[in-house]
């Protein structure tokens, strides 16, 4: 994919943005952090997001996750609420999700960069094609995977996933605008673990370390 013409165009766009003095989130080394932490052959669960957080110091390459020391965003607060209801896991005091990624949870945004403080500013420049290719590769993998598709955007993006081989879980987005329409109470986390165990895989430990700094390398 990196040799594709659209990726060359995307690189040119990002270079031009930087040359114009635009600040881009996350930092360059973190564009592909989700894939660095969760290689495709290790993927057990896919959670899809849309764009990186556009506030200062938030995004670090994993959807829904924020750096240690950053206030937990509202959607992630609702994810923690559902984890508590579903599995009895107390809400973490931080929003740093790298321990999930290291266990095989691919926390993938559809678009991997954003201009600082400008929501959705890098949509339509090629990232969507790249992340479509990632989802296709996971779909074609030999081992079964759980897809957690929250909200219509994620559900459309992964509509082609083979449900005869993979577990596809759908719910409204955990945003405060929609969480009470069916995300809260969806029990996706326990369903994911039951599926993984039924296929002979270890369940995901959805608990997060108390000290997120210990999870950074």
From Swiss-Prot:
Question: Where in the cell does this protein reside?
Answer: Cytoplasm
Enzyme class label: hydrolase
Q: Which InterPro entries match?
A: UDG_fam1, Ura-DNA_Glyclase_AS, Uracil-DNA_glycosylase-like, Uracil-DNA_glycosylase-like_sf
Q: Which segments cross the bilayer? A: none
Provide the primary localization: cytoplasm
Q: Which UniProt keywords apply?
A: Cytoplasm, DNA damage, DNA repair, Hydrolase
E.C. number: 3.2.2.27
**UniProt xrefs under Gene3D superfamilies:** Uracil-DNA glycosylase-like domain
GO MF terms here are: uracil DNA N-glycosylase activity
Entry's Gene Ontology BP terms: base-excision repair, AP site formation via deaminated base removal
Asked if the keyword Oxidoreductase belongs to this entry, the reply reads: no
A GO CC annotation recorded here is: cytoplasm
Catalyses: Hydrolyzes single-stranded DNA or mismatched double-stranded DNA and polynucleotides, releasing free uracil
Residues forming the catalytic site: 51 (proton acceptor)
By sequence similarity, the record places it as follows: Belongs to the uracil-DNA glycosylase (UDG) superfamily. UNG family.
Function of the protein = Excises uracil residues from the DNA which can arise as a result of misincorporation of dUMP residues by DNA polymerase or due to deamination of cytosine.
Q: What is this protein called?
A: Uracil-DNA glycosylase
């Amino acid at each position: 994919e990196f040799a594709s013409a659209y990726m060359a165009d995307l690189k040119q766009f990002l270079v031009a943005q930087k040359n114009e003095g635009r600040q881009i989130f996350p930092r360059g080394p973190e564009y592909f952090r989700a894939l660095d932490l969760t290689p495709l052959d290790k993927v057990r669960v896919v959670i899809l997001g849309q764009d990186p957080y556009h506030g200062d110091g938030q995004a670090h390459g994993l959807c829904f996750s924020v750096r240690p020391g950053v206030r937990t965003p509202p959607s992630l607060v609702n994810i923690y609420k559902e984890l508590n209801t579903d599995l009895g896991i107390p809400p973490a005091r931080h929003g740093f999700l790298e321990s999930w990624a290291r266990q095989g949870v691919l926390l993938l945004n559809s678009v991997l960069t954003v201009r600082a403080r400008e929501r959705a500013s890098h949509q339509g420049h090629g990232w969507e094609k790249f992340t479509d290719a990632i989802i296709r590769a996971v779909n074609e993998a030999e081992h079964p995977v759980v897809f957690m598709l929250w909200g219509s955007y994620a559900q459309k993006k992964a509509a082609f996933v083979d449900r005869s081989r993979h577990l596809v879980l759908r719910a409204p987005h955990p945003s405060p605008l929609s969480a009470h329409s069916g995300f809260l109470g969806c029990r996706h986390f326990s369903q994911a673990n039951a599926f993984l165990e039924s296929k002979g895989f270890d369940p995901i430990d959805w608990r997060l370390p108390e000290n997120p700094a210990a999870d950074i390398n």
